[in-house]
Every structure is written in C-alpha cells, then in structure tokens.
Amino acid sequence: MHVTIQGAGRGIGLALAHHALTAGASHLYLTARNPEQSAGYAQLPPTPNIHWFAMDFLDPDSIANTGDSILADAPHLDRIITTAGLLHDGNLQPEKRLGELTPDAMLKLYQINAMGPILFFKSLWPELRRAHPLVAA
C-alpha cells in the first residue's frame, strides 16, 4: 500500500504514519513544513520506502510542487491523508471575543485549515481521477 500523509512531522500525522507502517504500508510519502527539523523525521528517517517532502500550506507553489514530486515518485497512491491544521502559533492565539479577531489572523487560519488541504488534493488530482480504489481524507 502506498500512503501519503500531509502533516506527518508530529501529532496525528506522525501517529498515522507509524500506524500505516505497522499495518503494512509498503511506501510512505510524508510531508512537513520543515521535515528535517520534525519529530517525524527523527523517528521515521528517509529510507527507500519512506519519502519526505517539505510543504508549506501558506505557499501555493510549495503545495503544487510537492504534489508533482509525490506523483513523480509514487507509482500509485492508495491513501491520501491530510492532518495539518492551525489553532495557534507564536503570534496567533484562539480568540475568546469577536474583538480579538483580526483580518490577518483569519486569513492565515483559512489558508492553512481550508485552502491548504483542498490545494493539496488538487495537486494530486491525476491520482484521484484514476480508476483504482483510493481513500482520501
């Protein structure tokens, strides 16, 4: 089984990568913003069966290029999973009142949590259109 997991650098994505390996995945195509600096990369270093790609949901070109690279490396995909999302970071905290909302924060959250996953699936569209069974989540 060939599995792509977006957001495999830590958290849920990393847990799913470990699960995919124990469930018998033959190839993993994993993404993280900075793979070499991620916990996932330390736990699942690149091998002939584990492929890491740098991808940033705030950069549409990064998403498209990553999709192209995955499609070039993978003979086919059986699972495409996207897990990354953002609730807060150094400058962005969950809002408790409407007065705390800012256009910049809302745009960043929308880009990462809504547009990023859709653009990632779009970048893999040739694989999604194939006739073989594929699960995308």
Where are these regions (language model features)?
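Conserved internal alpha-helix within the Rossmann fold of NAD(P)-dependent oxidoreductases
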Residues: 116-121, 134
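N-terminal Rossmann NAD(P)H-binding glycine-rich loop of SDR-like oxidoreductase domains
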Residues: 9, 15-18
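Conserved Rossmann-fold cofactor-binding substructure of NAD(P)-dependent oxidoreductases
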Residues: 58-73
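Catalytic Tyr-X3-Lys loop
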Residues: 99-118
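Conserved NAD(P)H cofactor-binding loop of Rossmann-fold oxidoreductase domains
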Residues: 83-94
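Conserved glycine-rich Rossmann-like NAD(P)H-binding loop of the short-chain dehydrogenase/reductase
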Residues: 21, 25-40
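Rossmann-fold cofactor-recognition segment
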Residues: 45-61
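Hydrophobic positions on the long internal alpha-helix
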Residues: 120-124, 128
